[in-house]
């Protein structure tokens, strides 16, 4: 997260993303620091170099509340670049149904063979009592160290 937002880890953008349509907030997280950094770098490019960023570390107190999107259930062209409406429609339904506060999904940046070992985690910020299920362990300040092109 940028320096502006890291103090409120439950904040989210209402801009459209791969798994959410514009106007519906969703928090995107990763299974670890490397995939989280890769995702952000792929989305933003080097536009954010030279700024300080924060990685928010958290634990989910009830892992049984993490849903998993199985490979066989992935929407057609789920990893299309740029992302398509089909994954946004899937995410909209998931957000509105509120079956799970968390949903494990594959990264469009990695080969599917890495899933579910490496994955993204979608978090529904409107899930009832969401804050009861997440424990924040802190944050790590970092800078992207990119080679100049």
Question: PLM features: residue spans?
Answer:
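Active-site and NAD+-binding cores of ADP-ribose-processing enzymes
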Residues: 1-12, 21, 49-149
């Amino acid at each position: 997260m940028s320096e502006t937002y890291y103090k409120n880890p439950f904040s989210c953008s209402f801009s459209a993303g791969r798994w959410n349509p514009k106007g519906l907030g969703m928090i995107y997280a990763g299974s670890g620091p490397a995939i989280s950094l890769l995702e952000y770098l792929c989305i933003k490019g080097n536009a954010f170099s030279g700024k300080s960023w924060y990685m928010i570390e958290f634990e989910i107190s009830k892992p049984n509340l993490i849903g998993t999107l199985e490979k066989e259930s992935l929407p057609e062209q789920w990893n299309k670049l740029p992302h398509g409406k089909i994954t946004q429609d899937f995410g909209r339904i998931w957000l509105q149904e509120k079956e799970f506060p968390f949903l494990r999904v594959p990264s469009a940046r990695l080969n599917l063979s890495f899933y579910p070992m490496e994955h993204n985690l979608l978090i529904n910020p409107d899930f009832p009592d969401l804050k009861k299920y997440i424990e924040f362990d802190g944050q790590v300040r970092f800078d992207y160290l990119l080679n100049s092109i």
